[in-house]
Amino acid sequence: MTIKLYLIRHGIAADREDYANDDDRPLTSKGRKRTTKVAKQLRDRGLHFDHILTSPLVRARETAAILQEVGLGEQLDEFPSLAPDGDINTWVNWLEQWRQNRNRENCLALVGHQPDLGNWAELLVWGEAQEKLVLKKAGVIGLNLKETGVPLGRSELFLLTSPKWLI
């Protein structure tokens, strides 16, 4: 059985110049509405996440909370490596532990930032990041991961969509 991994970029956030610290930027009203619409579409298509990991930045945490609020998953944890410039290898190590401890769970969501999520997808599929995959705000990348072994360069891309195709 493969593991389904969904990489979800945070929704539209407040302007940088309005916040002294980029980490503190929340979703805008439009970002919240659009993200909620995307989340409901994913839910209505039968998706459910066994575990949601999110960047600790406010806009990503708010996006992950929306996923949880619409019923896409119950288990939600912050994961520091999903912050900008985070290390995929830290997540790969987490994944190995998760695989060993799970009970038939096979669907994960990671909420983070661009270009990081696009780069992570490239690393998982092709084994190298070239910043070619662009993920729009509230966009989704879907990957199939092998059941065992390091997923880098061994995963399959099955979805890359912007929110406009989901709402």
List each language-model region with its residue ranges.
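Glycine-rich phosphate-binding loop signature in dinucleotide/nucleotide-binding domains
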Residues: 45-47, 98-106
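Active-site-proximal alpha-helix that buttresses catalytic centers in soluble enzyme cores
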Residues: 2-82, 86, 131, 135-137
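A glycine-rich beta-strand to alpha-helix segment
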Residues: 105-121
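Short phosphate-binding loop-to-helix
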Residues: 83-100
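Short, solvent-exposed aromatic-acidic interface loops
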Residues: 156-167
